[in-house]
C-alpha cells in the first residue's frame, strides 16, 4: 500500500516538473547601441534569488523566469565578460 502511494506521489511530482516549464521573459527592447551593451551576468550562477541569466539586445541581465516562452537564456561561455561590452 505504501509503495503505491509513493509511486503515485512520485509520478505527480515528475508530471508537475514537466508541465511547469520556465523561460526567460521576452525582452521589450529590440535593439541597443553598442555603447550601451552591458552584461550583469554570464551564467545563472551569477544571479541570486532564483533568477536566471537572460540575454537581451542590451546585454545579459538577471531576470525571474516566467511561464511564457519568448525570451532567451544567456549562452555564457569563455568569451562572456560582465560589465560594459565594447
UniProtKB/Swiss-Prot annotation:
Tissue expression profile of the protein: Expressed by the venom gland.
Q: Keywords for this entry?
A: Antibiotic, Antimicrobial, Disulfide bond, Secreted, Signal, Toxin
| GO biological process, alphabetically ordered | defense response to bacterium
Q: Does the keyword Secreted apply?
A: yes
Describe the location of the WAP domain by residue ranges. Answer: 21-66
Write out the similarity annotation: Belongs to the venom protein 11 family. 01 (wap-1) subfamily.
Function per UniProt: Has antibacterial activity.
> Per its record, how is this protein called by name?
U15-lycotoxin-Ls1d
